[in-house]
């Protein structure tokens, strides 16, 4: 079976919205899942998606959660993800580490929960 990228992304986004995500965060998360599948990393793409929906229903993932900075010193920061969507928390941590590296030459972000 062949599924086109845009169709996959839109379908995943729609499911995320039906499970409590706002449109913007659903779109970003769905894009991450679809991109992983497109890149051949199926374990973080569509194959993971049913488990994510199950985890939302069980309360293991909080669709309203946003990461919070807990501590930082120079180019090193520690964040609490508050059980938010993993691919959104990971993207935020990566972007923050890049920003720290642009300022300091190195950036390290640790994310818990």
State where each predicted segment sits.
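Glycine-/proline-rich flexible loop or hinge segments
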Residues: 13, 36, 73-83, 105-108
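Generic N-terminal amphipathic, Lys/Arg-enriched alpha-helix
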Residues: 1-19
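Active-site cofactor/substrate anionic-group-binding motifs, chiefly glycine-
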Residues: 47-98
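A glycine-rich phosphate/pyrophosphate-binding beta-strand-loop-alpha-helix module
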Residues: 91-113
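N-terminal and secondary-structure boundary signal
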Residues: 17-20, 35-42
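Flexible, glycine/charged-enriched surface loops at secondary-structure junctions
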Residues: 21-28, 43-45
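Short, contiguous, pocket-lining structural segments
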Residues: 4, 21, 25, 85, ...
């Amino acid at each position: 079976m062949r599924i086109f990228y845009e169709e996959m992304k839109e379908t995943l986004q729609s499911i995320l919205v039906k499970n409590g995500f706002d449109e913007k965060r659903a779109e970003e998360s769905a894009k991450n899942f679809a991109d992983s599948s497109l890149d051949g990393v199926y374990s973080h793409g569509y194959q993971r998606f049913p488990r994510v929906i199950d985890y939302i229903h069980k309360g293991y993932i909080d669709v309203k959660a946003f990461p919070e900075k807990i501590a930082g010193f120079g180019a090193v920061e520690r964040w609490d993800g508050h059980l938010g969507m993993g691919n959104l928390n990971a993207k935020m941590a990566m972007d923050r580490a890049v920003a720290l590296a642009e300022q300091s030459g190195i950036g390290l972000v640790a994310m818990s929960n």
